[in-house]
């Protein structure tokens, strides 16, 4: 899949789960719609995130606010959230509505938490995991569970689907954060090391802080001096966990 087309990971997981738990592996129209809703919510959150992060590219192409303007980007994200909510209501399943509504709340909460903890070298790993759950894992966990709800699974199986989605989501986020240091712009679909430059301290940085106290000095002054970002990257390269 090319960088500009996106991964389609989230709807793909929903469709695979839905097919696996459906009689004769046949997808229903509601399961297909759930996958579409999942991608709408994800895309809407990316449009808004790019505005907040002032990102110029996403998946190798201009972001919405770069191509048009901030006002259009905010309204486009709002429209996608609204359309997702409309299709969600038309599934006529209040439990699915609750699950996906929780996701939208988590996405906003995660973005707030991320920005409140910018350049905070004292940030705990548990805060990072909680933020990662809100921004990434919640959507995969709750949409996986929603697929089970539409199939009429019992509570035990629904919990298993939720846990599966949660673990996949957290693992995906950690790998994505590692790639921010080991990948290139083309692979990532966005500028490399953009998270660190923006003050978002991810798993590799938190581990590096345990080994290199000088890194906390650079981060606490918000990488303000000329060579601070390069020095921070050198610290990352010598982190045993990243290697």
Question: Residues of each region from the PLM?
Answer:
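All-alpha prenyltransferase/terpene-synthase fold signal
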Residues: 1-240
């Amino acid at each position: 899949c090319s960088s500009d087309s996106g991964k389609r990971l989230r709807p793909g997981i929903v469709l695979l789960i839905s097919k696996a738990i459906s009689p004769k592996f046949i997808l229903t129209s509601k399961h297909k719609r759930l996958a579409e809703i999942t991608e709408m919510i994800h895309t809407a959150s990316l449009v808004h995130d790019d505005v907040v992060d002032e990102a110029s590219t996403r998946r190798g192409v201009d972001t919405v606010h770069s191509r048009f303007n901030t006002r259009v980007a905010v309204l486009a994200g709002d429209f996608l959230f609204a359309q997702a909510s409309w299709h969600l209501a038309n599934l006529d399943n209040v439990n699915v509505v609750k699950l996906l509504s929780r996701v939208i709340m988590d996405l906003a909460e995660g973005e707030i938490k991320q920005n409140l903890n910018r350049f905070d070298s004292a940030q705990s790993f548990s805060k990072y995991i909680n933020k990662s759950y809100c921004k990434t894992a919640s959507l995969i966990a709750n949409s996986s569970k929603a697929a089970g709800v539409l199939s009429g699974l019992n509570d035990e199986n629904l919990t298993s689907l939720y846990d599966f989605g949660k673990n996949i989501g957290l693992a995906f986020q950690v790998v994505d954060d590692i790639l921010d240091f080991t990948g290139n712009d083309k692979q990532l679909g966005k500028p490399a090391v953009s998270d660190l430059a923006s003050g978002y301290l991810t798993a590799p940085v938190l581990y590096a802080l345990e080994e290199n106290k000088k890194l906390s000095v650079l981060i606490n002054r918000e990488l303000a001096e000329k060579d601070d970002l390069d020095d921070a990257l050198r610290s990352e390269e010598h982190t045993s966990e990243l290697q």
